Swiss-Prot record:
Note on how the cofactor is bound: Binds 2 heme b groups non-covalently.
Record protein name field: Cytochrome b
UniProtKB keywords: Electron transport, Heme, Iron, Membrane, Metal-binding, Mitochondrion, Mitochondrion inner membrane, Respiratory chain, Transmembrane, Transmembrane helix, Transport, Ubiquinone
Membrane topology value: Multi-pass membrane protein
Assembly: The cytochrome bc1 complex contains 11 subunits: 3 respiratory subunits (MT-CYB, CYC1 and UQCRFS1), 2 core proteins (UQCRC1 and UQCRC2) and 6 low-molecular weight proteins (UQCRH/QCR6, UQCRB/QCR7, UQCRQ/QCR8, UQCR10/QCR9, UQCR11/QCR10 and a cleavage product of UQCRFS1). This cytochrome bc1 complex then forms a dimer.
Additional record remark: Heme 1 (or BL or b562) is low-potential and absorbs at about 562 nm, and heme 2 (or BH or b566) is high-potential and absorbs at about 566 nm.
Function: Component of the ubiquinol-cytochrome c reductase complex (complex III or cytochrome b-c1 complex) that is part of the mitochondrial respiratory chain. The b-c1 complex mediates electron transfer from ubiquinol to cytochrome c. Contributes to the generation of a proton gradient across the mitochondrial membrane that is then used for ATP synthesis.
Gene Ontology biological-process annotations: mitochondrial electron transport, ubiquinol to cytochrome c
Gene: MT-CYB
InterPro entries: Cyt_b/b6_C, Cyt_b/b6_C_sf, Cyt_b/b6_N, Cytb/b6-like_sf, Cytochrome_b, Cytochrome_b_C_euk/bac, Cytochrome_b_N_euk/bac, Di-haem_cyt_TM
Needed cofactors: heme b
CDD domains assigned to the protein according to its UniProt record, in alphabetical order: cytochrome_b_C (cd00290), Cytochrome_b_N (cd00284)
Species for this entry: Chodsigoa parca
Disulfide bridge partners, by residue number: none
Amino acid sequence: MTNIRKTHPLMKIINHSFIDLPAPSNISSWWNFGSLLGTCLIIQILTGLFLAMHYTSDTMTAFSSVTHICRDVNYGWLIRYLHANGASMFFICLFLHVGRGLYYGSYMYLETWNIGVLLLFAVMATAFMGYVLPWGQMSFWGATVITNLLSAIPYIGSDLVQWIWGGFSVDKATLTRFFAFHFILPFIVAALAGVHLLFLHETGSNNPSGLSSDADKIPFHPYYTIKDILGVLLLMLALTSLVLFSPDLLGDPDNYTPANPLNTPPHIKPEWYFLFAYAILRSIPNKLGGVLALVMSILVLAIIPLLHTSKQRSMMFRPFSQCMFWILVADLITLTWIGGQPVEHPFIIIGQLASILYFLLILILMPITSLLENNLLKW
């Protein structure tokens, strides 16, 4: 009798995706982040579901409902902080996953890469709307500032902003619709992640060398299931440590003050994972220019396959490109730092230089470095 996992229509799909999947024998721990992102998404959906059971999306009661969750609901504080810090872990895994793709040339799988860029946008939108829900000072002013950016769109800008707000300012209608979107988007993200995997399994995984691994495959289970479980355990350790020891480490103290439209906080800034894009937005004095730069800072990922000039796929054997890659990483860390600083000297000029360097590296310096390496190797 044949095994049910190989014959049953549904089990067969799971089998081909997670059990009998032929995987390269040399993929490193940098390939763990896909499964970690899946784990993060499941944690976020489950904790979010339990939070939604007690949360009320009304401007009068939103803040106090979050307080009620933390004080009165059984383990409500744990669920709330798992959800808030789970978002941070989600973005750490996302950035490392994208970085891995850039370093090892995984962007050559065009469909998988483009779905990934779409996923990044969807997760960023979800996180932004989630940040508005507790209705603290930073929630309200963050929502006001970021939605207001759409008014920079010529002709339809101001109408578009009022349409999104559902009125003439961020108010009850805005909060209610943000809650609705924040609830539905993770399920869209889950569906997109399924498509992401579908396209990945059409080609098979890339590996650190960037060479074809068809001649040397191993089954996903037990080798990579065990490896993924180790990754998940380390993720859980990091998340629980953060939640139980310093749950507010990555948050903003201003968000413990209820939203007040009459009182603007001294420094309006988003969560830490958006600071690099926020720094790029602020470094351009023109409103429309800033918005375009903000969008392009993420959208530039979509054109990276077109900028691949090297004859090798991976950066494993390309020391000059590696150097450029790590300069880019340092630049992104600098932008993240600048995004959290006030708009004054010397932070303004540092932010502008870091923003220029970001686009310069991706669009010009890295492709030129690849061409140089081709010539050095006489290819």
